[in-house]
């Protein structure tokens, strides 16, 4: 069972998040990631289902960045290792043509065709002939706005 958000969320730090024995590994992926707009580098992604969320652990060199996507209601958060707590994401975006997902602008970007293909499979009507989807989250971590392609330019005005 994969949990996804609407669009991107529907479309995705040094974490010390342990994987409980009840966690189910969905997949592992060797891919490319970038932090804070830097050039992409090799990274490994592990997706695991847990009680009420899916965790995406991104191992980038010595750094581990974890994104949590939870359902009911859909929320996305990033683990803040210094504060030792989850921080709600402010925004996320996905570009289907490059299989790239970015969180909080370009704080973390990852090439992840596994996730985006599953988003397309689970939301064929919403994602048909779409390339870009952006999601904005409110202070409570819930989606408060989303847009596709040229509609994202309208939202910025």
Which residues does each predicted region cover?
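N-terminal signal peptide c-region/cleavage motif recognized by signal peptidases
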Residues: 18-20
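Cysteine-centric segments in proteins
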Residues: 23-157
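Bacterial N-terminal signal peptides that target proteins for export
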Residues: 1-8
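Bacterial N-terminal signal peptides
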Residues: 9-16
């Amino acid at each position: 069972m994969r949990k996804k958000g609407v669009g991107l969320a529907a479309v995705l730090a040094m974490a010390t998040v342990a994987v409980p024995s009840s966690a189910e590994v969905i997949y592992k992926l060797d891919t490319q990631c970038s932090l804070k707009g830097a050039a992409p580098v090799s990274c490994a992604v592990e997706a695991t289902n847990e009680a009420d969320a899916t965790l995406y652990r991104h191992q980038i060199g010595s750094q581990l960045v974890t994104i949590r996507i939870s359902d009911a209601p859909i929320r996305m958060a990033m683990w803040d290792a210094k504060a030792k707590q989850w921080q709600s994401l402010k925004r996320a975006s996905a570009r289907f043509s490059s299989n790239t997902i970015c969180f909080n602008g370009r704080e973390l970007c990852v090439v992840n065709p596994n996730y985006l293909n599953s988003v397309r499979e689970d939301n064929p009507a919403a994602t048909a002939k779409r390339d870009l989807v952006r999601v904005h989250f409110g202070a409570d971590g819930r989606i408060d706005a989303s847009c596709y392609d040229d509609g994202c330019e309208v939202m910025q005005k």
